[in-house]
Amino acid sequence: MEPVWPLLLLLAPLPWGEGGTPVKPLPYQDLPTLGLTLPGVVRAVYLGNGHIEAAHVVLETQARNPEGLLRLAQQAVEEAWRARPSLAEVDLSLYGAPYRAEDLPLLTASVPQGRAREFLALREPRRYDRLWLNPGKTGFLPPEPVLEDKPHPEGPESFRAKERATQLLQSRTGPRPGVIYHGDPGRPFAALTFDDAPHPLFTPLLLDLLARSGVKATFFVIGRNAEAYPYFVRDLVAAGHELGNHTYHHVRLPKLPPEEVRRELLLCNQVLAAITGTTPRYFRPPGGRYSPEVLRIARELGLATVFWTDDPGDYAGLAPGVLERRLEAHLRPGGIVLLHDNVVGTLEVLPFFLRKAKERGLVLGPVGALPLARR
């Protein structure tokens, strides 16, 4: 059969941005703070989703023994609830001093209000299932602030042209194995996806909103985040959501040698398999930046590479009304919506978006349901 690329290229959209496109930083998010007096507080913030509030307390400490870290975490939990009794959950991240965001924490914990008494009575940290102790891992790459805009194929022009044509073809006929740009435009179903999970402040609030609506989604998980907050990964799975691979360190893959690309994907797979017992089926490259080598390695690891049709720019600090208009304008059968797990704007517009999809008769769900959607 003759290839259809030349015909499709006549109809293809303008070329996507190339590798030189500047990286857009996450905007500063001015969150309300808790007035904690405990020494070593780096940040103590809280946030609500219209139904519940959660807090995230970050501390730096010279302590290294598990019992000392636990005592500090317990003091922080007590102070947080004294400062704001309405909190439904307090989440903690304890780092070695001096604090560096690129390090893995020494200890993390999640304390729902209903388990506060249990947590405060602990004498041994390993007896609490929503606590993680760093086993001594160091030397991690800092995560890059690579934010998704639109897919960026990098490589020969023939490869970029082929990918543009594939994108256009799928927008008319639906997804194909291996690389997914679009769902079936003839089915009243769209995929809802969140990148950069899990986050100790935002993930519990997102889970609560999705549970209230009965909607399932795909969360593309950063391996180092999953390693430090495994209980949130378990929460996602227990709630019926799907997990995808978003690399271990969240770095641009095309610039890496093939063995490092493979390592990024393998490490994330291994972390998720250790936590959940299952290896993910889907992968999304950070920033949507990929090359023939990235696709080949993902395919060899049994991962389908997933892109998106709709990115409203929730990371850009836009007003809720702007995000709502963008989401509504692009809501369509077969769409793949990209939002982020760590942005205030996502929490603000998600209820509106879920309601609009229902009004239009569109079912929202995980990527894995795209080929299975039926009228």
Model-predicted regions and their roles:
Residues 155-252, 256, 260, 264, ...:
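Active-site beta->alpha N-cap acidic-glycine motif
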Residues 227-231, 235, 251-375:
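Catalytic domains of cell-wall/extracellular-matrix polysaccharide-remodeling enzymes
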Residues 84-96, 218-222, 279-285, 367:
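Surface-exposed patches in mature extracellular/periplasmic domains of secreted proteins
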Residues 18, 89-192, 199-204, 353-356, ...:
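N-terminal pre-catalytic segment of deacetylase/amide-hydrolase enzymes
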Residues 68-86:
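Short, non-transmembrane amphipathic alpha-helical segments
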Residues 49-64, 187-194, 249:
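Acidic/histidine-rich, surface-exposed loop or edge segments in extracytoplasmic proteins
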Residues 5-13:
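Sec-dependent N-terminal signal peptides
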Residues 14-52:
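N-proximal, solvent-exposed amphipathic alpha-helical segments enriched in charged/polar residues
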